[in-house]
Each structure stands twice: as structure tokens, then as C-alpha cells.
Amino acid sequence: MTRLLVECTHVFKHPTINSGIQRVVRNVIKQLPERVGDVECLPVISLRGQLYRVTRLAPLDAPLLNAVAAFGERLERLAHRFWQWHQRLDPRCPSKLTRRVLYVAYRLISFGLFGCPLRLIRLMNRKQLLKRCTPLQHQPGDQLVLLDSSWHSDFFPHAEQLKRDGVGIVAVIYDLIPLTHPQFYDTRLVQVFSAWFDWITRTADGYMAISATVRDQLRAELQRRVGPAHTDRLWFDYFHLGSELDLHSARATVEPRLQQLFSTPEPVLLMVSTIEPRKNHTYLLDAFERAWAAGCTARLCIAGRIGWKCDALLARVHNHPELNRRLFMFNELSDTSLEHAYAHASALVFPSFVEGFGLPLVEAMQRGLPAMGSDIAVFREIGGEFMAYFDLQDPQSLADLIIRFQQSGQFPAARNVADWRWIGWREASAQLTERTAHNVLKAPSAPARPYAHCP
């Protein structure tokens, strides 16, 4: 009997991370159906070359261990920022010797401040992890659905062994942006993603994308890399994401500064995303500055954690004359505070250069909040005539929409967002499993192709 083994390793290890892929994985697993027809659906993780069935995705009710785990996650974020600092300094070194000294200093400090404590924390966490899962024996005909961000080379040999044992490999593709737009990412992430994508193109039997746009981009990329003959032996499909904020709690309090922002009558346009170059906050500020110069009183609220390559933008925001007057930024909002922002904002604005889906658009529009977005294919797929679109080559295009919206009180889209409908996470999880099962049961199996760096 075919089983869908839906992999969620990273989210299982880091259940409190609440952005991007992690939000998708957590919600799909929570709503995973027990079976689709005759196909059983099981959430699984890969630990040290063994599959485990997840019995509890959320952390245990152990305050001390949970506090240690939370501290470990903060320490990992600090370690990443320290690495980013090193990456910024390295190109400025005047000689190879200076660069080498900087690298050695970075490694020594990193090992002392982060390496040793993180190893100890991971050892403590391992005991908790094993209380939330049970060993699972794979079977020929099983299908391993790589839902999580499995961009780790230590996972490759295990997946290939499963494939040699008759397990099919299904890759969930969120986007190809590190390949198509590498300028938006750190060099190391591009290298990691590229290595993973090279591996997955040789290993996967089929692909599930998170939008029809990404599915089509993926098929074209594989045709370019491995040729039409090989690509035609694979299957490609997609599912759409849900929109509920699952970590919202009625008992949690709203960020006081955010509450104060929405207590006055002037309109607030909201942007929700990680702060990084691809999201195009610079364009957003340019557009709002033009609108403000024209007398517009609409305010801009930027909500999102601090990402990468954003020092200049953060400096611009922190030194902006409109900061805390008509410009506001929040970097650590809870789901409860985010729900409050969606409920009280006048519109969402999303000027991203490129996306695989655009989850904030769905979260906003599902709550009746109209959205303005970049005129890109995937946003047209999601919003259709219910969104307003602007030209990324001209900030005045967005400024004009903002001014017209405030002056007329009518949102500048062809159709009313009240008539727009979207699926929830239960339907999203059903789409993923049903379409995967359908494609797996009709597709021929493909031979294994070992990863080049396997021992």
C-alpha cells in the first residue's frame, strides 16, 4: 500500500519559528488528512539516518527545556548575524593576510560564543525530540514528500538510500528565486540552494509547487538543465497555500505601539514581510515619500523581522523624518498583533520583485483587507481583478494609487475584495496530498541517481 510520508524535520526541531516555509509546514502538518483514498498520510522527520513518525509537532509542556530551546534559537540568529557581519567585512580587507586573520578570528570567536553552547543545547533538545516521535520503518512504494526546507547535505545520503529501497521522492518547491535572482541573497545561501537543487533534479520523481507560476518556471528550468526527454518522464503539479494565522491567541495582548497606531482615524497601509532586498522596501519608501510630498496623510506600517542585506534600508527608516509620525516599523509582532494589524489597516501593499506565492496577500484578502501588489505573474494568479497593481519601474505608479485611494475612499481594483474567496489550510493540505497521490499512482518510477558527494 502506498503511503505519503510528509517530511517536516526543520519545523519539528524549531516549532516556534513562524515565518515563510515554517508557517506553511506547520499548518499543512496540523491539517494533514489521515488518508486520501487508499493512501495513508503520515508526518515524518529524518534524524541521524532514520525515519520517525511525528506524534506531536508542538514542543512538550516542559518550561525549562522549552526555555533552553528558545534561547538556542535566539543564539542561532545571533550566530547568523555574526556570520553576516563577517561577510560584510571580508570584501573590505586590503590583503589576503588581513582576510585570513579576520577569518581565523571569526572562527575562534564563533566557536567560543556560539559553537559550544549550541552543541550543548542540541544535546539537551535531542532527548525532548525523541519523546515527540516514534521510529518508522519505510516500505517499497512509500513516497517521501519533502515539504520542509531540506537544504542540508547530511540529509541527501539518507534520502538516496530510501530511494534505493523503493521509496519515491517528491519535492515541494516554494520558489526558484536563489537561482533566478541570486543578487537578493547571501552567497552561502545561494550555494546551498544551488547544491540542493542540483541534487533534487537528479533525485526527485515528481514535483509539487506552491503556485501554477512556480510549477511552470520549474518545468522550464528542468528542461534547460536535464533536457526535455528526462523532464517528460517526471510529473509536475501545484497546490495553493492557506491563510489562517494558527498562532493567534485570544489571551495574548496586542503590541501597545501597534494599538496606538490604529487608534487614530488616518488610513494605514500595511506591509508584512521579512526585511530583505527582494521585498523592495526601498521602492515602497520612495513611493510614500512622493505621496507625502503631494499632501497625502496616509501612514505606512512595516511589519516583519529583520533579514539580510538591509543595513542601508534600516538606517534610512531609523533616520527618517516621518518615523513614528507617518512611518512605523515593527520587527517582532506576534500572530495576535498581526491579526490586529490586518483587521484595522486600510490596505496591504506588497512591492516584492519576485515571489513563489505571496502569503501576506492571501492572509490580508481573506480577512477583507484589499491589497496593492507588484504587477508580477504570481500576484495576478492569486489576486486577479480583486487587487490593484503598480509598475515596479516607477514609484509614482504606487504613489498615484495611494493618493487616489485616500482621496476617493474607493479601492482602485476592478472588483471588490469582499467577493474574493480562497482556501484554508485544511483545503491546502488536502490539495497537496490528493494531487500528490493522484500523480504518484499514475506515474512510472524513476531509477535512483546517487548524490556526487555521498560516501
Name each model feature, range by range.
Residues 1-455:
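Carbohydrate transferase catalytic cores enriched for Leloir-type hexosyltransferases
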